[in-house]
């Protein structure tokens, strides 16, 4: 499994816009092959927000990065006041 993390900082008072983008992103991702889930998080006091998407395989993640992410990055970049932090991680799941 693979995870994609995005963290960005906005100007003050952008929480409702960030939530709208999160809702749109989830709606776009939920039916895509390999999508396992997403967690959105934020710190409104410091205007910092982020997401962590889970994908079944690296190939699934790569396919999404080519097709959907350019538009999502455009939207995120419009909200961000500094370059967003983007990372991809291989996920380790402990064995029982």
List each language-model region with its residue ranges:
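Low-complexity, intrinsically disordered Gly/Pro/Thr-rich segments
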Residues: 70-76
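Short S/T/G/P-rich N-terminal loop/turn motif that feeds into the first structured element of a domain
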Residues: 1-49, 56-67, 79-96
């Amino acid at each position: 499994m693979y995870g994609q993390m995005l963290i960005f900082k906005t100007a003050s008072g952008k929480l409702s816009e960030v939530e709208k983008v999160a809702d749109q992103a989830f709606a776009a991702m939920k039916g895509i092959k390999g999508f396992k889930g997403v967690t959105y998080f934020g710190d409104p006091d410091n205007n910092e927000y982020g997401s962590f998407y889970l994908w079944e395989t690296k190939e699934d993640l790569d396919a999404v990065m080519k097709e959907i992410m350019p538009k999502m990055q455009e939207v995120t970049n419009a909200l961000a006041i500094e370059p967003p932090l983007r990372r991809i991680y291989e996920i380790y799941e402990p064995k029982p």
